[in-house]
Amino acid sequence: MKKFERLIGEWHGEGEVSMEPPMKISVEAKIERLGEFIVISTVGEPAEMPDSVSIIGGAPDSEPQPMHYFDARGVKRLFMMTLEGSTWKIWRAPGEDWNGPHGPGFNQRFIGEISADGKTIDGRWERGTGDAGDQWGIDFPINYFRK
């Protein structure tokens, strides 16, 4: 979990969801250690960006870490997370809640690039479509700034 320590701190995120009209989003995120785990808590605006908490860890350090996500809507999801060099990746765990384009879930991933000085993360959430959920498009970009 040591490689994730560079994410620890308080962050402000800004992005925009492509819809009519476009929806600007704002997120306050706090990333901290809890023993051998990492906890991410977020407060989002507008209301469509639900407040959430995620608990990361439990796998050997050489493997992707499970990320258990819970939000104010009652949604719970299992993601996997890695940090390789400056690239932070989060993706839905294989088979987790994905039942094709008409199912209750959807395939989703985050890719973020951490700046050399560690003060910004240029990121985007992507959504998988198609019968296998493997045709990727940008769901929304979001950039984080260390407070």
Model-assigned labels for residue ranges:
Residues 9, 62-63, 118:
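A short, compositionally biased
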Residues 1-10:
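N-terminal helix-cap/turn-to-beta initiation motif at the start of protein domains
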Residues 120, 124-147:
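Edge beta-strand at a domain terminus
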